[in-house]
Amino acid sequence: MEHSSWHALIKAQLPEGYFGKINQFMNQVYVQGTVYPPKEKVFQALLTTPLEEVKVVILGQDPYHGPGQAQGLSFSVPDSIPAPPSLQNILKELSDDLGVKKSHDLTAWAEQGVLLLNACLTVPAGQANGHAGQIWEPFTDAVIQVVNHLDRPVVFVLWGAYARKKKALVTNPHHLIIESAHPSPLSVYRGFWGSKPFSKANAFLKETGQEPIDWLR
């Protein structure tokens, strides 16, 4: 993380010594019990999508809390693991919008400039939101602010009430915000179906002279 294009800019947004607190927190929780994702994957979103390549941000809440699911990218799971319900619904909406993506590992999106960021970067096994409010939110808010300060137009995809609160951090008029209900089975019928976020994001990227994302990869 220290050698990534993100490090200095995130650090500048945070109180002095905050990175040290994050390291302390991680050293503590990974010793105390099972935590997801694996420690080496906690910053995977930032390592896979360098700041200079960000075109789209898809904001999640926290990692999946079952064995083998979380890989440090919001909503994504390895292909060896069945897609959780929210991801199934994302891929169904993609299928209705642009076509079928065969893989439910979203790494190919991240490699094309889609920052798959969770607001909370770790979770205790079996406890959704178990690390919420402890350390991560100021850090991931700083990530959003760093992207917000870019001159290059970026698409922010905000699904559900939690993600939509982060709209307050996106103040740059160059950027596009696409928001809808969350893809979880509880809320998918409240406006996620038919929202076409993928084609909308690509239309904006083309309008602003950028390469669209190949969402089917």
Curated annotation (Swiss-Prot):
Annotated compartments: Cytoplasm
Protein name: Uracil-DNA glycosylase
Catalytic activity: Hydrolyzes single-stranded DNA or mismatched double-stranded DNA and polynucleotides, releasing free uracil
Keywords for the protein's UniProt record, in alphabetical order: Cytoplasm, DNA damage, DNA repair, Hydrolase
Assigned GO CC terms: cytoplasm
Similarity comment: Belongs to the uracil-DNA glycosylase (UDG) superfamily. UNG family.
GO MF, any single term: uracil DNA N-glycosylase activity
Function: Excises uracil residues from the DNA which can arise as a result of misincorporation of dUMP residues by DNA polymerase or due to deamination of cytosine.
CDD domains for this protein: UDG-F1-like
Annotated active site: D62 (proton acceptor)
GO biological process assignments: base-excision repair, AP site formation via deaminated base removal
Enzyme class, first EC level, given as a word: hydrolase
Keyword DNA damage: yes
Main location, first listed in the record: cytoplasm
Entry's EC annotation: 3.2.2.27
Pfam families: UDG
